[in-house]
Amino acid sequence: MLAMWRWVTKRSRLRRGHAHLGGNKGVRGICSLYLAGLSRGLSRVHAQRSHAATMADAGIPDEILYSDISDDEIIIDGDGDGDSSGDEDDDDGGLTRQAASRIATDLGFEVLQPLQSGSEGRVFVARRPGEADTVVLKVGQKPSTLMEGMLLKRLAHDNVMSLKQMLARGPVTCLVLPHFRCDLYSYLTMRDGPLDMRDAGRVIRSVLRGLAYLHGMRIMHRDVKAENIFLEDVDTVCLGDLGAARCNVAAPNFYGLAGTIETNAPEVLARDRYDTKVDVWGAGVVLFETLAYPKTIAGGDEPAINGEMHLIDLIRALGVHPEEFPPDTRLRSEFVRYAGTHRQPYTQYARVARLGLPETGAFLIYKMLTFDPVRRPSADEILNFGMWTV
């Protein structure tokens, strides 16, 4: 049966501002012997740069940096489902959907269904003629597609997306990926309600296991969100879309803007130094959304205007106390004035407390959304809390 991988009703298209900020640059730490120099060519149509920090310091507005150039493709039909159209959109440096589909056919696949294109290429559900099992094809000609494939070839974990094949047709790379039932955001949308703590715990534990594996290999995902978590059911969960990943991460540094505004950690939004703890923040946002759907962590239904405005909304919604801001950071110097003192520091966030979430869930959310990244526990530490019953 053709399973669904519905990218069309995601917040990244309709509600929240999706952005692979520097996502095409993120994997440039891998395979330097094979891909030396490719990172210089990694760019987005709206953000061509080799050093994210340079542009951030220059004050480049977020509407340029935080961009998803496939946003204009969406069409909502009468049934509320969506499909991407409009090959005039330049998602992949001029590779149209028709051209990508022809390449997939030339590589021996029968294309069954187009999916919403991402910044790294055109995406299809397909299968080999005569075979029942379906796969997902990501077809792209940007260096980032090749680099994501090279990264996936290094990975082997039940909770991280695997790579079935990596094929090439001239300058175009085709990644052959497993086809899951849906992503977590679509799962929540289809059930139109939150998960209970038992199921939410199973999902987030799998995500944390995948993150612990990546972080153990010094890989930072940088775009952990419900749309990038794929599942068959709550016991079969996979963290995917490593197009924004950064490798060889050791000490905190400013690795550029990447990911999605609404799930970015405060240190990224403030353009401070950061490390793998940003993925733990993203997982905390995911846990909140699974338990509080359709509510969002910062409140409101409109997409974030830009990163700084979202950060201000976040500080106010959570009721972050001035003492919780990390010292000697731009986060403190520029944003502490938006903090409040109506809540004691290092206690449950106001936003979470008002919703009456399960006690275990509220505790995990607070830990993963610890505002100071130095105090924020790692994925491994959270997995060892001893409170998991799922």
Curated annotation (Swiss-Prot):
Phosphorylated by UL13 homolog; this phosphorylation regulates subsequent phosphorylation of UL31 and UL34 homologs by US3. Autophosphorylated. GO terms for molecular function: ATP binding; cyclin binding; cyclin-dependent protein serine/threonine kinase activity; protein serine kinase activity. It catalyses: L-seryl-[protein] + ATP = O-phospho-L-seryl-[protein] + ADP + H(+); L-threonyl-[protein] + ATP = O-phospho-L-threonyl-[protein] + ADP + H(+). SUPFAM superfamilies: Protein kinase-like (PK-like). The active site is at D223. The keyword Transmembrane does not apply. It is an enzyme of class 2 (transferase). Residues 109-389 form the Protein kinase domain. The keyword Protein biosynthesis does not apply. Its main location: host cell. It is found in: Host cytoplasm; Host nucleus. Multifunctional serine/threonine kinase that plays a role in several processes including egress of virus particles from the nucleus, modulation of the actin cytoskeleton and inhibition of apoptosis. Phosphorylates UL31 and UL34 homologs, two critical regulators of capsid budding from nucleus to endoplasmic reticulum, thereby facilitating virion egress. Modulates and redistributes host components of the nuclear envelope, including LMNA, emerin/EMD and the nuclear matrix protein MATR3. Phosphorylates envelope glycoprotein B (gB), probably to direct it to the cell surface. Belongs to the protein kinase superfamily. Ser/Thr protein kinase family. This is Serine/threonine-protein kinase US3 homolog. It comes from Suid herpesvirus 1 (strain NIA-3) (SuHV-1). The gene is PK.
